[in-house]
Amino acid sequence: MSPQTETKAGVGFKAGVKDYRLTYYTPDYETKDTDILAAFRMTPQPGVPAEEAGNAVAAESSTGTWTTVWTDGLTNLDRYKGRCYDIDPVPGEENQYIAYVAYPLDLFEEGSVTNMFTSIVGNVFGFKALRALRLEDLRIPPAYTKTFQGPPHGIQVERDKLNKYGRPLLGCTIKPKLGLSAKNYGRAVYECLRGGLDFTKDDENVNSQPFMRWRDRFLFVAEAIYKSQAETGEIKGHYLNATAGTCEEMLKRAACARELGVPIVMHDYLTGGFTANTSLAFYCRDNGLLLHIHRAMHAVIDRQKNHGIHFRVLAKALRMSGGDHIHAGTVVGKLEGDRQVTLGFVDLLRDDYIEKDRSRGIYFTQDWVSLPGVFPVASGGIHVWHMPALTEIFGDDSVLQFGGGTLGHPWGNAPGAVANRVSLEACVQARNEGRDLAREGNEIIREACKWSPELSAACEIWKEIKFEFDIIDTL
């Protein structure tokens, strides 16, 4: 045999195609504490056995290719290959299976969400043997978690910076999202903040357009923040969107926010990309800025039940890449969100140790080994009548982000903010007194209306507004 086709062990190379299961199916494998574990929902093509499909996923997302190659003999495949160690049928679904795959830690670059996703959700999602494939969950081992900085500051540090405790934080997205001049935009911010909100927000698609360049917006918003702080005696903030066409421009905008002395900036982490997001998170920690994350484009990736990536995986990835807030649905508003599923990934964002719980879609126990937590942001079609449910569902460590539910108040932005703040304070007080928000919520809001004309007007205008549609992404 010629040297070109001889392996390290001196055994001849046998060309050809062999079943993936001969190499990648290891049902007796005991997972290691250092393995990254993945749960994939597979829909094989007709005639493709589930075992072969699961092994193809393990192979194509790690060391495998479609045919045997002679360079396999130049490394130790048993050390580096992904292993499909279990396959379970999905109850109630025809021809759907959950394939569990273990990846050795050495396959991944330290501190790189980009590299992790390039491997695990790369070419395998276009594999012809699969009709559909969805990544349902990942177990990130402590050994890998410790290579990430994570959120720039986290929940407790943010509360200390703001000096605000014992309640959810309140925010508002400025509307109309596009078309306002910088000066009028700053005026809208000021009215909301002086009315009682903690934060206002750039919409995700506000960057630097002809009608409002970013630097002008930053200056007028900073003026609004300082003026509202002087009037209310509270620390205020506005999520200045630093998302840009290049990383250099993004960091320049963040640096301007720092120089203006404002507390927080914002990034669209999926459209901006994980490399850019991680770079911004490092900058924010080094320079004392909080980082708000918007998930624009997430539904393209996560909404279909049988294909894509579940949001709980995107949420874990954000906690690793870095962000102090992230939008997480509302359960009760206009955007998709099953209650149990939402509470599952909310815990994955906030808590340090989360037990496996399939009833909430959590496939693996996750230990974050003290990586800072992330505030979930409830946003999308919410108003004062939703406040009891939002307070009960999300608890104190959350941001309740209104938009039309503040700016649509018949008396203007500041009264809309007053209505939001009064309804929140009423719900928190009622909860602290032992009242049941889920059962008594409407009564609590009506009682608060008696001493707040702003809240009464808000309740009247939105009393018939509901968003009742079937949830697409269920367990």
From Swiss-Prot:
The record marks K334 as: Transition state stabilizer. Binds 1 Mg(2+) ion per subunit. The modification N6-carboxylysine is found at K201. RuBisCO catalyzes two reactions: the carboxylation of D-ribulose 1,5-bisphosphate, the primary event in carbon dioxide fixation, as well as the oxidative fragmentation of the pentose substrate in the photorespiration process. Both reactions occur simultaneously and in competition at the same active site. Residues 1-2 form a propeptide. Its main location: plastid. This is Ribulose bisphosphate carboxylase large chain. The modification N6,N6,N6-trimethyllysine is found at K14. It catalyses: 2 (2R)-3-phosphoglycerate + 2 H(+) = D-ribulose 1,5-bisphosphate + CO2 + H2O; D-ribulose 1,5-bisphosphate + O2 = 2-phosphoglycolate + (2R)-3-phosphoglycerate + 2 H(+). It is found in: Plastid, Chloroplast. Belongs to the RuBisCO large chain family. Type I subfamily. Mg(2+) binds at K201, D203, E204. PROSITE patterns: RUBISCO_LARGE. Its cofactor is Mg(2+). Its EC number is 4.1.1.39. It holds the Pfam family RuBisCO_large. Keywords: Acetylation, Calvin cycle, Carbon dioxide fixation, Chloroplast, Disulfide bond, Lyase, Magnesium, Metal-binding, Methylation, Monooxygenase, Oxidoreductase, Photorespiration, Photosynthesis, Plastid. The lineage of its organism: Eukaryota, Viridiplantae, Streptophyta, Embryophyta, Marchantiophyta. The active site is at K175, H294. The disulfide bond which can form in the large chain dimeric partners within the hexadecamer appears to be associated with oxidative stress and protein turnover. InterPro entries: RuBisCO, RuBisCo_large_chain_AS, RuBisCO_lsu_C, RuBisCO_lsu_C_sf, RuBisCO_lsu_fd_N, RuBisCO_lsu_N_sf, RuBisCO_lsuI.
